[in-house]
């Protein structure tokens, strides 16, 4: 939100870079936390991290707050500006529909990701992979970072609506492979890679898709709604999957997750359609002589 409010013309690309860097947070801080906890109590570890936030993050945030923002971000009245290069807004008549479909897409993706990631190892064990499931599941993190890196290098001209469809399609493809290929280790490894790729892209489009479809005005509020929809379904998805795995078969539980992933694909595909309906047709020249 801060990147967009600062008025940078390449906000979508900046969000991609920031997401890529943030992907290394667990890689750096999980081992660091373990090392600190070997020497300090858990309260002292939290104190160290709180001090880092106060001494490092807070000054940066205060500095960003003092930077001038464009009139659209400050609420000043001005002439409507032309959309930036990273914006392809839908028409006013279709905005409400696009907003609801986008919330549905992020809610479905959040449900699938939260359910699978929390139960990754138990799920793979239940499918007959055994202790190898722990090793295979480690492919998720590198795949997630790889998707962000690939998108940063080669996805600059790809519309974020298409990227959202690709992300949810990767989730659905991974679940399909898991449902049909288990307990084959190679099939499950490909599932983990596909799931990591989809998760990495979802984390990017969570910030860039509302910007492209709706523009900068009201961006913060819209991102908040999208995040709320995703967090809401993410909160109860692991519990619901555990209940389904206990009361139903693992296969039926995966089928439900696959259906939810396909709902996400459909939701973002509808937004692509709405966006194309809002794109003005390019007029053709009359070939007849004047």
Task: List the predicted regions and their residue ranges.
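Cytoplasmic helix-loop-helix junction between adjacent transmembrane helices
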Residues: 1-20, 215
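Helix-loop-helix hairpin linking two adjacent transmembrane segments in secondary transporters
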Residues: 18-69
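A late C-terminal transmembrane helix in Major Facilitator Superfamily
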Residues: 26, 213-248
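A membrane-interface helix-boundary motif in multi-pass transporters
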Residues: 35-51, 243-261
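Flexible cytoplasmic inter-helical loops of multi-pass small-molecule transporters
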Residues: 65-88, 280-284
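Extracytoplasmic gate region of multi-pass secondary transporters
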Residues: 94-146, 151-153
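C-terminal transmembrane helical hairpin of 12-TM major facilitator-type secondary transporters
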Residues: 106, 137-143, 157-209
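Helix-to-loop junctions at the C-terminal end of transmembrane segments
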Residues: 147-160, 245-246
């Amino acid at each position: 939100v801060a990147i967009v409010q600062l008025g940078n013309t390449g906000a979508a690309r900046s969000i991609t870079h920031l997401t890529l860097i943030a992907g290394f947070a667990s890689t750096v801080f999980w081992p660091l936390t373990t090392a600190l906890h070997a020497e300090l109590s858990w309260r002292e570890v939290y104190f160290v991290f709180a001090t880092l936030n106060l001494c490092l993050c807070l000054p940066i945030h205060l500095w960003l707050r003092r930077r001038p923002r464009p009139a659209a971000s400050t609420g000043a009245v001005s002439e409507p500006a032309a959309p930036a290069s990273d914006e392809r807004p839908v028409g006013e008549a279709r905005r409400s529909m696009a907003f609801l479909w986008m919330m549905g897409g992020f809610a479905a993706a959040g449900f699938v990701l939260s359910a699978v990631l929390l139960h990754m190892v138990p799920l793979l064990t239940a499918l007959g992979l055994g202790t190898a499931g722990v090793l295979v599941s480690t492919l998720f993190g590198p795949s997630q970072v790889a998707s962000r890196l690939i998108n940063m290098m080669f996805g600059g001209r790809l519309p974020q609506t298409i990227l959202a469809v690709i992300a949810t399609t990767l989730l659905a493809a991974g679940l399909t492979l898991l449902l049909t290929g288990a307990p084959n280790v190679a099939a499950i490894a490909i599932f983990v890679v596909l799931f990591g790729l989809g998760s990495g892209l979802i984390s990017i489009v969570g910030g860039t898709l509302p910007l492209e479809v709706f523009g900068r005005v009201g961006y913060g509020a819209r991102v908040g709604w999208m995040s709320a929809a995703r967090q809401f379904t993410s909160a109860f998805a692991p519990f619901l999957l555990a209940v389904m795995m206990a009361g139903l078969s693992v296969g039926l539980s995966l089928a439900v997750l696959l259906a939810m992933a396909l709902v996400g694909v459909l939701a973002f595909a509808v937004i692509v359609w709405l966006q194309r309906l809002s794109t003005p047709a390019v007029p053709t020249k009359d070939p007849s002589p004047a």
